[in-house]
Amino acid sequence: LSSFVGREREQADIAQRLQSNRLVTLTGPGGSGKTRLALRVAEAMIASYPDGVWLAELTPLSDPALILPTIAAVFGVREMAGRTLLDGLLRHLRDRQTLLVLDNCEHLIEASAQLIETLLRGAPRLRVLATSREPLGHFFLYQ
């Protein structure tokens, strides 16, 4: 692997922004290092999230309806009788101090933004670090 040099200031800035913003989106063109930067930040912040740092990779998804099951699977949440998958995921996340890294949201931007907003509303200790070639709406962007 090549070394990751020269982005320490960006890493520190993003980590600081995650302390005061529940969603930070890294935007930029393909190949600009968004994913690698997000993973470095997440790795550096593991101690800040006692319930874990989790990665959901959206690249292989073509159907927006698959975002929720993909994220739920990352956390080991399954649909159960009497409750929806979303309810189960929110119940799982509600009291957990967790960082979710959502990688490559750009091709499912609307559905990603809507689900992130729902998760943040229902899980007050959740933080999301997203990567996308396009902004995820009105949330904080880091370019």
Predicted regions, residues:
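Dynamic helix-loop-helix/coil hinge segments at AAA+ ATPase domain boundaries and subdomain interfaces
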Residues: 1-11, 103
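A conserved switch/coupling segment of P-loop NTPase cores
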Residues: 16-19, 42-50, 86-143
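A short linear-motif detector with a strong N-terminal bias
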Residues: 3-4, 33-37, 78-80, 106-109, ...
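Conserved beta-strand positions that form and line the central face of beta-propeller blades
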Residues: 3-4, 25, 143
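Phenylalanine-focused residue identity feature
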Residues: 4, 71, 75, 139-140
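Post-nucleotide-binding-loop coupling segment downstream of the phosphate-binding loop, primarily
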Residues: 9-32, 36-97
